[in-house]
């Protein structure tokens, strides 16, 4: 009888401890549809790195790319993928957001021209048409780049091409585009049998920055859960760097019919070097320099203290 009682006591004790092993649920909304920029997130999901860190992650693709930070601010999702330059503007507008991690720790934005155009330097853009998608930051980016070689935005004709960056170049609608991601648009042009040339903002006076970051509501960010998410991302990134081919297979397995494309295959190789090896790491100096740049360009009223918009979670 004592043996039976001890057995049931053991079983009951085990059952009482089970809830502690329940996975933490966390939701993340991407900035756009799934692509190689999200490699670390998707591979962490497909290879079980989230699961190993006791997380059940819901990955959401937005219907509108403007939604993710707004939904994170409203606590409708736990995390959102956003852009470092936009974070300053969002916080200035009153959104209670804070950067908690990085996905892409290098600028991807660039000015792209076709090689056949014979535009061999930024100086050659004088009097030419430059296409853009998003006014504001891209205007400031281009103006700074042009200032570094003695020109300004007044020396070019800016044309809003919406999101048709590569098509506008290929059709001759514009001579150059700003806002082209160096890991995508150059490959998109190559698939059309055209060679592109890219000019990188960080080489023409623009402070280096993180292209893609993770943001959360500053008043409700759960350090433990977010920390586990960042640990899984770091593990996935290490796996990506060590096993790029296997990681590619894991990536496309998420949505085989949509992700296994020639463009994604090319972009994959060009994206891996830009992945944040230490997603939680915060470079305070770089973030403050970009804040000052945004203020100088009139994109935000003032450069806030770092603690107002970015944290490094242990």
Curated annotation (Swiss-Prot):
Is Cell division one of the keywords UniProt gives this record? no
Some GO term, biological process aspect, for this entry: which one? thiamine biosynthetic process
Q: Which InterPro entries match?
A: NMT1/THI5 (IPR027939), SsuA/THI5 (IPR015168)
Tree of life domain: Bacteria
Keyword tags = Thiamine biosynthesis
Give a Pfam family name.
NMT1
TM spans (from-to): none
Similarity comment: family membership = Belongs to the NMT1/THI5 family.
Extract the PANTHER family matched here: 4-AMINO-5-HYDROXYMETHYL-2-METHYLPYRIMIDINE PHOSPHATE SYNTHASE THI11-RELATED, THIAMINE BIOSYNTHESIS PROTEIN HI_0357-RELATED
What biological function has been recorded for the protein in this entry? Probably involved in thiamine biosynthesis.
Q: What is this protein called?
A: Putative thiamine biosynthesis protein HI_0357
**What is the source species?**
Haemophilus influenzae (strain ATCC 51907 / DSM 11121 / KW20 / Rd)
């Amino acid at each position: 009888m004592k043996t039976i009682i001890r057995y049931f006591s053991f079983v009951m004790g085990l059952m009482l401890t089970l809830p502690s092993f329940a996975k933490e649920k966390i939701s993340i909304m991407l900035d756009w549809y799934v692509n190689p920029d999200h490699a670390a997130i998707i591979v962490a999901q497909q290879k079980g790195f989230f699961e190993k860190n006791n997380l059940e992650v819901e990955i959401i693709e937005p219907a509108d790319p403007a939604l993710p930070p707004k939904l994170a601010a409203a606590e409708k999702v736990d995390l959102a993928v956003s852009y470092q330059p936009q974070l300053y503007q969002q916080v200035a507008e009153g959104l209670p957001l804070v950067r908690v991690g990085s996905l892409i720790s290098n600028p991807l934005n660039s000015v792209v021209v076709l090689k056949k155009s014979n535009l061999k330097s930024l100086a050659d853009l004088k009097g030419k048409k430059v296409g853009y998608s998003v006014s504001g930051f891209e205007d400031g980016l281009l103006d700074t780049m042009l200032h570094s070689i003695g020109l300004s935005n007044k020396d070019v004709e800016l044309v809003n091409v919406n999101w048709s960056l590569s098509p506008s170049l290929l059709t001759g609608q514009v001579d150059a585009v700003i806002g082209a991601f160096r890991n995508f648009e150059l490959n998109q042009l190559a698939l059309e049998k055209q060679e592109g040339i890219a000019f990188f903002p960080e080489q023409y006076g623009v402070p280096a920055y993180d292209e893609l970051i993770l943001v959360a509501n500053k008043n409700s960010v759960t350090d433990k859960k977010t920390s586990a998410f960042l640990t899984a991302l770091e593990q996935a990134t290490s796996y990506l760097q060590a096993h790029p081919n296997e990681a590619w297979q894991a990536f496309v397995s998420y949505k085989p019919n949509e992700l296994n494309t020639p463009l994604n295959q090319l972009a994959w190789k060009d994206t891996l070097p830009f992945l944040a090896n230490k997603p939680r790491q915060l470079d305070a100096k770089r973030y403050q320099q970009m804040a000052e740049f945004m203020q100088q360009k009139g994109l935000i009223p003032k450069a806030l203290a770092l603690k107002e918009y970015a944290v490094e979670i242990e």
